Amino acid sequence: MKPRSKRLLLVAGAVALLVGAVALVLNAFQQNLVFFHTPTEVAEGKAPVGRAFRIGGMVETGSIRRAADGVTVQFAITDTAKVIPVSYKGSLPDLFSEGKGAVVQGTLGPDGQFQASEVLAKHDENYMPPEAQHAVDQAQKAAQTVQQ
């Protein structure tokens, strides 16, 4: 085999390996990518059914219900415009309470019930995840526009 052919074969092999590595990285990234949606977007059907994503907003006052098993909790997340029912099996963060900001990650069932696999509570009086704050602001603006 001539040196030129060897070089060409080596370059082609290196390009093939590089393309394969990039494809594997992109595939892994896509599988771990979790999108954020507001309760309004979820209620309007803009969120994927059966695929993991996050919902952020406020825990609706009076919505927390604990099951007899002591592990399952049901509550609702709202952006003041729409309300999404959430079911979570596990222990909730200490800062989780009604009327406070929260972000839940999980999947939306065909019945519209959000099955959370993770619950994140806001950290202090002044903190709210930027996406959740934006969603609440947008919902309040929309509600004011409708009232006028």
UniProtKB/Swiss-Prot annotation:
Biological processes annotated in GO:
cytochrome complex assembly
Q: Which residues lie on this side of the membrane: Periplasmic?
A: 29-148
> Principal localization?
membrane
Gene that encodes it: ccmE
Give the Pfam families listed for this entry: CcmE
Q: Which GO terms describe its molecular function?
A: heme binding; metal ion binding
- Bridged cysteine pairs (disulfide): none
Binding positions (heme):
123, 127
Give the record's GO CC terms: plasma membrane
Q: Which residues lie on this side of the membrane: Cytoplasmic?
A: 1-7
State the annotated membrane topology for this chain: Single-pass type II membrane protein
| Entries under InterPro entries matching the protein | CcmE, CcmE-like_sf, NA-bd_OB-fold
Establish whether keyword Cell inner membrane is in the entry.
Answer: yes
Membrane-crossing residues? 8-28
**Annotated keywords:** Cell inner membrane, Cell membrane, Cytochrome c-type biogenesis, Heme, Iron, Membrane, Metal-binding, Signal-anchor, Transmembrane, Transmembrane helix
Q: What is this protein called?
A: Cytochrome c-type biogenesis protein CcmE
According to its UniProt entry, what is the function of this protein? Answer: Heme chaperone required for the biogenesis of c-type cytochromes. Transiently binds heme delivered by CcmC and transfers the heme to apo-cytochromes in a process facilitated by CcmF and CcmH.
Q: What does the sequence similarity comment in the record state about its family?
A: Belongs to the CcmE/CycJ family.
Localization per record = Cell inner membrane
